[in-house]
Amino acid sequence: MAMIFCSTLFSSPPLLSPLTSTQTKPSRFSKKLRARAQCQSMEDHIHDDLLRRKFMEFPYVSATRKQLMVDLISTVEDRFQPLLLPCSLPPDVRNFKNPNGSAEASIYIRSGEKSSPIDFFIGSWVHGKIPTGVTLNITTISAFLKSSTKAPNFTLEVIQSSPTSLVLILDLPHRTDLVLNPDYLKEYYQDTNLDSYRQSFLKLPGVKPYVSPSLFVRCVVSPAASVLKIDVEEEEQLEEIWRDHVGPAAKEILGVWFERCAREEDDEKRAMGEEERMELERRDKSF
């Protein structure tokens, strides 16, 4: 295709009479360029769709967990579709394996248009064995807002180390100091009753709080975050908790994020000084 394009580009154009208008109708050359551009755009779209399908397979987790991840990603895309740019990561970054095939990962990132409240959202899955011999399967969905708002982001991360054990992080991480901004705490956590999900989880058998060994993780999650260790005896028990409790809660919390956080705010509420905005951007980039 490249050779044909070069041949067309450097071939001699037909001679025109001085009285001939070059703008009466498109030349054969411009039609070919337009056709090639359309074909390339179609090829890019097909290729992007194939890579997206590959990502959406979530091949190393249960069907129940896969369905929730697919549902959440599709919901975000459907909600903001006109305001999201296509994923621009190279194919070898979007899906890759190590040389011996013992580890595989896939990443999917879409940035927001200029008018979108979303800066970007990311989905990923990672499968691999660690030196201790444990096989880890990590799935993540996170959505990050622009610095035009201080509203919380959304995150769901699941770290599974066996068929009957996993760590769950489900949260709307805050983006400002909650002690200095009690109204923020009230609006996004108290008024939304976000802590009720964590409390409900802790009533289930096999579910207990998880304390991350990372001080960084412990300071960035909100007071209402569901940071939990689920450890049960049977695989079916884990599937039941995921299907009947984690899935519905994740969808409801994403709905809260849509309605309370990922929306256009009025100018008065959105107004921030330049120093405050720069501080927010610096904080966001640290993640």
PLM segments and residue spans:
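Phosphate/adenylate-binding glycine loop and adjacent helical scaffold
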Residues: 3, 71-74, 78, 82-189, ...
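Charged, compositionally biased non-catalytic regions
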Residues: 31-100
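Mixed-charge (acidic/basic) macromolecular-recognition segments
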Residues: 169-284
